[in-house]
Amino acid sequence: RIGRRPNFNEPSSGEIVDQPNETTILSAAKVLGQTESGIKYGIINAVTGQEYGTREFESNGITKKDRFLIEPYSNYFVGRFTKPIVNDLSTVGFMATDLHRSGQNVKASSFKGDWLLNLMENRLEFTGEYATTINEENGYAGRLRLSYRDPSFWEIATWAGFSDNKWNVNAMGFQQKNNNWYSGARLSLRRDKPKGIFLNQNLSIRLWLSGLHNGMITRNNLELDFENNFTNYWNFGIKAEINPETYVDDDIYRDSRAFIIKDEAWRALNIWFATDRTKKYILRPYYKLNVGDGIANNSRGDQTELGLRLTLKPTNTVTFSVNSSIEDRPGFMQWVDVVESDAGRFSDSDGKYDIVYAKTKRRQINTKLRMNIAF
């Protein structure tokens, strides 16, 4: 976020018609180190300059322009340290960020404490963090994860997290949706040693739940993933998903007047195989099917995707890949816009408006090219 497009001040009248695409960084410093006791620390501090834009406004029926201060002088600070505990692979840590803008009494700080415990010869791992953001109001968030990996053939993991409606890291980071919670669990079974026609096999079952603090469930996903590696170095995989009805709150982050909508139950299947990975070329075709159950005779319809990835390895250091797919993705309740109208169905202090959603049908061909060169 340091040096991003200036956007702090907005004019109370008129509009900005021209402005810089980035903020000038006047100075920056980074300090990294480690003490004899094993404490690792890092500090970043940067100062950015003033940035002006051109404001266009009306005065007595005449269009005028002037310089407008969009971004004042600002100081960015990030500090982090970790300390080993119990063993060399377990740590506790602390992190702080602060943004101060010249001439502005606006708080923008955050603090985080975290831990990582690796026990029982790294088979058991427990990690988590708890953080607060200090802006106009204080927000809080936290998460944790506990896992155990058996040396022979299985692994289990569980995780959970939350954020309240005042959690906001947008000043120094990238804000994700707040005011929600999530939890999940995964069981994995594996065969690491060759047996019969298989080099190894992996089976995982994962359950993921998330929702809002008012009780609405926004994700309810059960997933099964099965992958097989054969002795001829071919691969085959299948992935299946079951998703009961949930609610979708994405649109309220576009516009607070939008709806939280109900999404239909759906099921998905993904089948793929790949040819010998030791050859100079590898083919990986796949097929995806997504079947919806519909809500009150509204259904997005079956979604399909057919694709092929071709990987070429002319040398040991150069790899080309071409990934092409054909998608057919119908949908319903797709957000369009909020339209102000004197005859609008809804109203607030600014007047009447309509909220527009639409059914969609997307058919497209995607092709991605990639080249990797190793030195």
Pin down the residues of each PLM region:
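Active-site cores of enzymes that catalyze phosphoryl transfer or operate on phosphate-rich substrates
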Residues: 1-100, 158, 181, 267-269, ...
